[in-house]
Amino acid sequence: AMLLSGSIAFAQNDDPTIMTINGQPVSRSEFEYSYNKNNSEGVIDKKTVNEYVDLFVNYKLKVLAALDAHIDTTASFKQEFLQYRDQQVRPAMISSGDVEAEAQKIYEEAKQRVSKSGGMVHPAHILIRLGQKASAADQETARQKAQSIYQALCKGGDFAGYARKYSDDQGSAVKGGDISWISRGQTVKTFEDAAFSLKVGEISKPILSEFGYHIIKLMGKKDFYPYDSVKNDILRFIDAKGIRERIINEKLDSIARTLPAGSDRETVLDQKASELSAHDKNLKYLMQEYHDGLLLYEISNRMVWEKAANDEQAQAAYFAKNKKKYRWEHPRFKGIAYHTKDAADVAAVKKCVKGKPFSQWAELLRRKFNADSVVRVQVEEGIFKKGDHPVVDSLVFKTSAKVEKVKGYPYDATFGKILKKGPKEYTDVKAWVIADYQDQLEKEWVATLRKKYQFVVYPEVLATVNKH
């Protein structure tokens, strides 16, 4: 039951009560959040504030009905809402400093590990490739080629130029043999031992690995990368490996230990959600919107959508009572348009479905004509008006519609009946009937809720929406 009150609750408040729903106050800011969000740029059916009041009250009444039905206590509701709460709250449990500290820790551990193994080297190489089953003659040819290149380099030949011309490692050859920085354990030991033994600028004699002969030039040496050059990579590693979540869980556990016995991560997250919501109205209303939206969906499903969709007896009764609503101006054809490979199947299709319920036609035809790998008949089923289907237009409505033959199916036909004034059965317009029946159930339900619960709207506060 609705009341319009002339007395404004909390008149001097910066955020006065705009209405009460069953005794529970609704602030002006909450109403504004919902109104502005649902009337933003791009919304087609915009409402005035006064028009929106009824929609908002109906929404709140449905949520109240869901709470009275204890939907908020179900396991499925709790699981879905807590997942959403976690998405909003968990990231706020740690600061960028916490993540930075973890990144520094990972960096220092990697730096120590690499430094202990000899640091990093920056080699370039020229590879003369040898297959694992290379003959002795092939090995000798490769060795001589590598030796020849090495001797040319010792006489001042350009390493990068020779790499581009002769190296069989195409990935590095285009870069003058450069394979960037490596540490121990990143490539084969023979190669590493040679690379780490060189001085910067020095070129190795040809060395043999499982890949073939390498001539290595050392471009540089260092203990490890500077932190700033790998920081972003480490941060990506932290997210990819779930380390951020581990840090959050450690923080939650740490805080829980300072709280009364029985407190756990959920306790801490609830407290954090309350704390954040107290300082951020947008977050508060965003979480409430999700919470109430879950309740609204489930209660609407129970009271309207599922009931309308599943109660075929009620659908039929609604159709019978409102049959005039479903009349159409022009005749429709209820049946099938079909295409066959063989002329004989045109009559066979009609014989197959004649006298059978329309709802069974598709399955009957599938079993008789298309059960094996050869599809003998292609079928389009429905209720067609003029212009919906060229075969129906041509053969039923006798228009000059252009019919394009389906490849491999030269014979077109139709079977069914013309409905002149409207559908004979509710199933002919079932989707339409269900939608209309849902609307009726919705209106009846809302009317019941408006009688069951009392709500008060304060016009003076309503007049200040978005004007303060």
Give the positions of each predicted feature:
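Peptidyl-prolyl cis-trans isomerase
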Residues: 12-26, 32-468
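Bacterial Sec-dependent N-terminal signal peptides
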Residues: 1-16
